Amino acid sequence: MTTPSDLNIYQLIDTQNGRVTPRIYTDPDIYQLELERIFGRCWLFLAHESQIPKPGDFFNTYMGEDAVVVVRQKDGSIKAFLNQCRHRAMRVSYADCGNTRAFTCPYHGWSYGINGELIDVPLEPRAYPQGLCKSHWGLNEVPCVESYKGLIFGNWDTSAPGLRDYLGDIAWYLDGMLDRREGGTEIVGGVQKWVINCNWKFPAEQFASDQYHALFSHASAVQVLGAKDDGSDKRLGDGQTARPVWETAKDALQFGQDGHGSGFFFTEKPDANVWVDGAVSSYYRETYAEAEQRLGEVRALRLAGHNNIFPTLSWLNGTATLRVWHPRGPDQVEVWAFCITDKAASDEVKAAFENSATRAFGPAGFLEQDDSENWCEIQKLLKGHRARNSKLCLEMGLGQEKRRDDGIPGITNYIFSETAARGMYQRWADLLSSESWQEVLDKTAAYQQEVMK
């Protein structure tokens, strides 16, 4: 069995000097360790509460490569279970979502209540004349399930920090999406799913730390849609063009701490997002006063930004896209994209949000394709021996980190930096190399102290 010491994890990641060896994106042994020590120990997004509002409502998803079913209980609480029959490991729930009174295995007919208990075994007296202790054979339950302002997370590790502690300062940035209006948020429409032939860490890192790519990777989209407010017809919608926000922003920052990352621009416009249509930008202008009262000016104006909660939950402010990067091997990721909107928005505005998110960041989105092409091409190149063992530069903004005194929390840097990427890979390496969460937290504290010297 391959151990963390065999893999020399800390020789592959050097965050103090800004180095990463790309073998971390290709090695199958590293990937198997990730499934155990990252996806088996971290808080992972499962669903939004709006997707399972009534008792018996369920939603099927994954924790790493483990299929799980999330279900609303009769008392209103939420449980999650491994989507696997305890008899011969068959899946017990197939529909993406729905409402049910029981989950029945199609192989031999074992049936489970929505609370996970085994409630029926066909031909039980004849098949098990010696008796069967059904209370012992219920579905395997995810032991830790918690919600944060509508987002449901699960964790297999009972020794992990609670969800709120795990989120840390990224919660302040997350609230900028979840808490703009009274009533919170909801998921609009279904889930868009597609597969990208790249390692899961590429998209996670980009959403945590990489605004830098947008100037070049998305240059053609900006040019086609209209690079400035010049009165031309190259518009996304009434009153909104694709003028790059970095051309007019007052300032910008990147946050990177505990493996999480975020970046955004300081703007003076309540509709400052380059990829939304007229109905959406009008909605942001009309609701700005409420958002400012709830969040303050900085977060109310924060509509152009990128974010990732370690390991695989990403979102873009303003564009209304929330997505999960489900790992499917060292060289493949399955994207699940949701449209998340204010619950208080009108149906017309929600439809506009959905159209806008799909147009830019759906599977055929004009920006999504730029990103996917980059990640896939990198993954192809890393098939080469020298390519996957040649160190890459992760030095952007190295040594320039600071803590702000204006109420914006956490370790920050200028937006064009790799502070969040270095923090993400440090948390990644610490998890793979540690036997316990306490050891991880001790290493995190030491790393952050070193960063802020």
UniProtKB/Swiss-Prot annotation:
Keyword Metal-binding annotated: yes
Protein name: 3-phenylpropionate/cinnamic acid dioxygenase subunit alpha
Gene3D superfamilies membership: Naphthalene 1,2-dioxygenase Alpha Subunit, Chain A, domain 1, Rieske [2Fe-2S] iron-sulphur domain
A GO CC term attached to the entry: 3-phenylpropionate dioxygenase complex
Role this protein plays: Part of the multicomponent 3-phenylpropionate dioxygenase. Converts 3-phenylpropionic acid (PP) and cinnamic acid (CI) into 3-phenylpropionate-dihydrodiol (PP-dihydrodiol) and cinnamic acid-dihydrodiol (CI-dihydrodiol), respectively.
EC number: 1.14.12.19
Originating organism: Escherichia coli (strain K12)
Domain Rieske: 44-142
Subunit structure: This dioxygenase system consists of four proteins: the two subunits of the hydroxylase component (HcaE and HcaF), a ferredoxin (HcaC) and a ferredoxin reductase (HcaD).
NCBIfam families xrefs: 3PPDioc_HcaE
